[in-house]
Amino acid sequence: MTKYRNLIPGLALSLGLAGAAIWAAELPAMKSLGLSALTLAIVGGMIVGNTVYRFVAEPSHHGVTFSKQKLLRAGIILFGFKLTFQDIAAVGFSGVLIDALVLTSTFLLAFWLGRKKLGLDEQSVILIGAGSSICGAAAVLATEPVLKAHAEKVAVAVATVVVFGTAAMFLWPLMYQGVRHLGISEFSYGLFAGSTIHEVAQAVAAGKSVSDAAMNTAVITKMIRVMMLAPFLIALSAWLANKHSGGHQKKQAIAIPWFAVAFLVVAGFNSFDLLPRALLQQIISLDNLLLAAAMGALGLTTHISAIRQAGAKPLLLASALFGWLIVGGGLINAGVATLLH
């Protein structure tokens, strides 16, 4: 009983930050900026963590750690209720292929540039690459337990998602206005936005800026990228196990991220449309709360001084990936459209 009682202060603090972030994310000003509850939760957590948290750090430690680890995994699993496999059919094979090519090329470019050219550490490169190539802050959060990454590196990766994802959200609609006279449809724009923008909330805003139809296509394409998170984490876990075996005959056991497998199972279950709409909305609201609490807890344990020490290289890597998402993402979209139509 004492063990569970020790969780209460930190859990209450994490959930309080999450509740405030969810409320703030619904404000018109925040919606217009495409700032999700996850982003606001980590910002709020960092503000508290670098000011008054030290006064309650000791009694809150266990609950904050629980939020970062257990609530995070539960949140990723429940995230599957936002998806159905029918979503894939809505954009067809071309949407899936575009997402797969953008994800793979962006992550491989991140690894090559980050490690070979910028000399960044492996954890930072993988976290930034995952955030840019898959689904922003949620991907960074989900990758953290597989890597056992440091909180400061996670916070830096999330910061790059916020900076460049927000830039994309404003820039993509402007780019479309400049090229729509070339006959590029709103459906094609939606595919491009969904396959290249970092966060789901940012994809919603970028699509809505053009039309409701573009927004629907962007969101579905984006959610297919989210669905690719599970196989990515399993592949990453297998690669890390093989790498850390050091080439010895006895391979290190693959630490399968079961929460990622459960995420896919939940998405599969959700595809049968068995749950009432009202219950599904309640589950999704709970999921938002759990993920925001995990982000708030992460912010509480992130020190600004450590982020400063990371220097400019993480931003340089993220900016290069941003450029690739514009140019490379555009070429991939155009190439697949030409190939399949």
Curated annotation (Swiss-Prot):
One of its GO terms (cellular component) is plasma membrane. It is found in: Cell membrane. The chain crosses the membrane at residues 7-25, 35-57, 88-110, 125-147, 154-176, 218-240, 253-275, 290-307, 314-336. The keyword Transmembrane helix applies. InterPro entries: UPF0324_pro, UPF0324_YeiH-like. Keywords: Cell membrane, Membrane, Transmembrane, Transmembrane helix. It comes from the Bacteria. It is a multi-pass membrane protein. Signal peptide: none annotated. Belongs to the UPF0324 family. This is UPF0324 membrane protein CV_0763.
